[in-house]
Amino acid sequence: MAISKEKKNEIIAQYARHEGDTGSVEVQVAVLTWEINHLNGHIKEHKKDHATYRGLMKKIGHRRNLLAYLRRTDVNRYRELIQSLGLRR
């Protein structure tokens, strides 16, 4: 199931850097993290769903690239985002 508009708007409101911000790295990573967590639950239940697994891997790669970009450009924002999302324990 795709992310609902309400949930996506809630995530955007929480991680936006300013009013109307939908494309900042923080927002993109937060939305991808929600989608990845959602797909992980699906994969645990449907182990042979290889198409979904491939989509999950693409989303993980996209998030990894965005996080690498953020780490290169602004380490403080990167650390705050990682901590708030609960990544890299």
UniProtKB/Swiss-Prot annotation:
Keyword annotations from UniProtKB, A to Z: Ribonucleoprotein, Ribosomal protein, RNA-binding, rRNA-binding
Xref: Pfam families: Ribosomal_S15 (PF00312)
PROSITE patterns: RIBOSOMAL_S15 (PS00362)
Gene Ontology terms describing biological process: translation
Gene Ontology terms for molecular function: rRNA binding; structural constituent of ribosome
Disulfide bonding pattern of the chain: none
CDD domains listed in its UniProt record: Ribosomal_S15p_S13e
Coiled coil: none
Top-level taxon: Bacteria
InterPro entries in the cross-refs: Ribosomal_uS15 (IPR000589), Ribosomal_uS15_bac-type (IPR005290), uS15_NS1_RNA-bd_sf (IPR009068)
GO cellular-component term (any): cytosolic small ribosomal subunit
Signal peptide coordinates: none
Assembly with partners or alone: Part of the 30S ribosomal subunit. Forms a bridge to the 50S subunit in the 70S ribosome, contacting the 23S rRNA.
Protein family (similarity comment): Belongs to the universal ribosomal protein uS15 family.
Task performed by this protein: One of the primary rRNA binding proteins, it binds directly to 16S rRNA where it helps nucleate assembly of the platform of the 30S subunit by binding and bridging several RNA helices of the 16S rRNA. Forms an intersubunit bridge (bridge B4) with the 23S rRNA of the 50S subunit in the ribosome.
Protein's name according to its UniProt entry: Small ribosomal subunit protein uS15
